[in-house]
Amino acid sequence: MPTINLNKWILQDMTGLNEQELVDYLFKLKSEVSPVSQDEYSIEVNADRLDMLSLGGIVRALKGITGKELGEPSYPVKDTDYVLEVEKVASRPYALACVIYNVKLSPDFYLKELIQFQEKLHDTIGRRRKKVAIGIHDLEKVEGKIIRYAPVSLSTTFIPLNQEREMSVRDVLQETPQGKQYGNISVWDSNSPAIMDERGILSVPPVINSDRTKITGNTKSLLIDVTGTNFESVMETMDLLATALAELGGIIGRVKVRGMSVDRSPVLRHTSVPFSLDDVNKRLGIHVSRDEAINLIRMMRMEVETNKDLAVIVPPYRVDIMNYTDVAEDIAMAYGYDRFTLESGRTASRGSLSEKSEIYRKLRTLLVGAGFQEVYTLVLTKSSYQRGEAVNIANPISVEYDSVRNSLLWNSLVFLSNNQHSRFPVRIFEIGDVVNRDDSKDTKYSNSTRLSMAIMDSRVSYEMLQAPLHEVLLNLLGVAPSYRRFESDIFMKGRSAEVVVKGETIGRLGEANPELLRSFGLLYPVLLAELDLDALRRVM
């Protein structure tokens, strides 16, 4: 859950609430408050409420839930003569911009809070800047009215934020902390995206801004650019920023856009979500009237179409409202979860195992029948045990648990190493999740369920493990697996194979490499197998 820090005195002054009232009302909004210092709160915000990652959003929500202000606020919006020209940028094709006048960035808390909001949006909807990146500039330092978004050569120079010398884009990507962290996201064919005015580069998204347009406590007007790989996310991010600043007294200035599917930015999109009041009452187990429901929705800072059928008018900042289920949840929050009463269940039903659980249960039964004993090991392990790329913990409590396992084999070897005194042969198996690199995911990693099998004995041969594995799969699938030659540093050369079912590779097995065994302190030979159970289920 994202967490933000806010000045307690400013928050209390803007909402008219004391500390206990803030705690109580924010809890009703699924947020938890804890003091950081005498002057600061830490607020843990529910992950879907991106609008509440800012001071303006928190204030707007609290004014609604307390009934001090109802419905969507009317923010001042005016058209400007600024123009954003969007050229073709293959790696990051979407861009929008807006102007905010009459901003308040002094005292320093307001500036700090704006930067915090920017980074929270980067980490959430922006997927660590891969999907969306935000640039915030002092408008008075921008040259001209034409803003361009276009590719630039890596040899193009500018002075990056908080630097004193001019650097090429290439040097920025290679030498600055931001460049090293985000530089590889959008570079293509020796080009990088850039936001530019008449004088030169304003920012190199998603990496860094120019020092020339750096915002300070004296900044009165802002130019905001949002770029990304998904237009919907770019548009929502811009709307969130504009409305949060408007809540604090800013005036939204719309920028003309050329080269995008919209001609003005911010879009400030409104959508309509119809809902049935009878259905909401049934879902929640309450009985609110039509007028009560309308009032509750307006407490959540939204408006309602009051024709024959009701529909919520979703404002630009409520990007979490997608269907009538979300509407029902908002009605429940405004109504108050503390007002719900407990009722005994009126019907009795019997649960059943999912298809996946049935398969794993049968697999366990077959493996136990084959003479193997199930073990359970922790998902966290020691990074020195792992082979290949793995997810490491940034601040581990213990070096023994500083990495997320990328295979079940390493924990099996640790288990065997700790049980070399046991009666031979030792036959074990484990079913559990692992985490591996997956570039197709936004997070770059994905979970998968694996089965590991291991046999330790004074003497072993490949067939000692291949035979029971073959029988288990034959009984489980009704189809005999086949085996294909496979080489890996994990196994001895010529004594390993891939397990293939219906043409798809589902695992590997073989005699463990003696060097691998020595690294785990094992004195006896070991047979290892690991199957991808997600792949196994696909071929069933």
Curated annotation (Swiss-Prot):
The keyword Aminoacyl-tRNA synthetase applies. Mg(2+) binds at D320, D326, E329, D330. Its main location: cytoplasm. GO terms for cellular component: phenylalanine-tRNA ligase complex. One of its GO terms (molecular function) is RNA binding. CDD domains: PheRS_beta_core (cd00769). Keywords: Aminoacyl-tRNA synthetase, ATP-binding, Cytoplasm, Ligase, Magnesium, Metal-binding, Nucleotide-binding, Protein biosynthesis. GO terms for biological process: phenylalanyl-tRNA aminoacylation. Its cofactor is Mg(2+). It is an enzyme of class 6 (ligase). It catalyses: tRNA(Phe) + L-phenylalanine + ATP = L-phenylalanyl-tRNA(Phe) + AMP + diphosphate + H(+). Residues 268-342 form the B5 domain. It is found in: Cytoplasm. Signal peptide: none annotated. Gene3D superfamilies: 3.30.56.10, Bira Bifunctional Protein, Domain 2 (3.30.930.10), Phenylalanyl-trna Synthetase, Chain B, domain 3 (3.50.40.10). SUPFAM superfamilies: Class II aaRS and biotin synthetases, Putative DNA-binding domain. It comes from the Archaea. Pfam families: B3_4 (PF03483), B5 (PF03484), tRNA_synthFbeta (PF17759). Its EC number is 6.1.1.20. InterPro entries: aa-tRNA-synth_II/BPL/LPL (IPR045864), B3/B4_tRNA-bd (IPR005146), DNA-bd_dom_put_sf (IPR009061), Phe-tRNA-ligase_IIc_bsu (IPR045060), Phe-tRNA-synth_IIc_bsu_arc_euk (IPR004531), Phe-tRNA_synthase-like_B3/B4 (IPR020825), Phe_tRNA_ligase_beta2_arc (IPR022918), PheRS_beta_core (IPR041616). Belongs to the phenylalanyl-tRNA synthetase beta subunit family. Type 2 subfamily. Tetramer of two alpha and two beta subunits. HAMAP family: Phe_tRNA_synth_beta2 (MF_00284). NCBIfam families: pheT_arch. This is Phenylalanine--tRNA ligase beta subunit.
